[in-house]
Amino acid sequence: IWGIGCNPCVGDEVTALITRGEA
């Protein structure tokens, strides 16, 4: 799982959570 407009990278799950929280 990766954040919107973000390439799959280490900690993609954390990025997704942050993105959803801020989105």
From Swiss-Prot:
PTM comment: the record says: Processed by the macrocyclase-peptidase enzyme POPB to yield a toxic cyclic decapeptide. POPB first removes 10 residues from the N-terminus. Conformational trapping of the remaining peptide forces the enzyme to release this intermediate rather than proceed to macrocyclization. The enzyme rebinds the remaining peptide in a different conformation and catalyzes macrocyclization of the N-terminal 8 residues.
Keyword terms: Hydroxylation, Thioether bond, Toxin
Would you say which domain of life the source belongs to?
A: Eukaryota
Question: Cross-link Cyclopeptide (Ile-Pro), residue numbers?
Answer: 1-8
Site of covalent link 2'-cysteinyl-6'-hydroxytryptophan sulfoxide (Trp-Cys)? 2-6
Q: Which GO terms describe its molecular function?
A: toxin activity
Cite the propeptide residues by number.
Answer: 9-23
Where are residues bearing (3R,4R)-4,5-dihydroxyisoleucine located in the sequence?
1
Could you tell me which residues carry 4-hydroxyproline?
8
Query: Which positions does the record annotate as the modified residue (3R,4S)-4-hydroxyisoleucine?
Result: 1
Q: What else is known?
A: The typical symptoms of amatoxin poisoning are gastro-intestinal distress beginning 6-12 hours after ingestion, a remission phase lasting 12-24 hours, and progressive loss of liver function culminating in death within 3-5 days. One of the few effective treatments is liver transplantation.
Family from the record? Belongs to the MSDIN fungal toxin family.
Biological role = Major toxin belonging to the bicyclic octapeptides amatoxins that acts by binding non-competitively to RNA polymerase II and greatly slowing the elongation of transcripts from target promoters.
Q: What is this protein called?
A: Alpha-amanitin proprotein
Say which species the protein is native to. Answer: Amanita fuligineoides
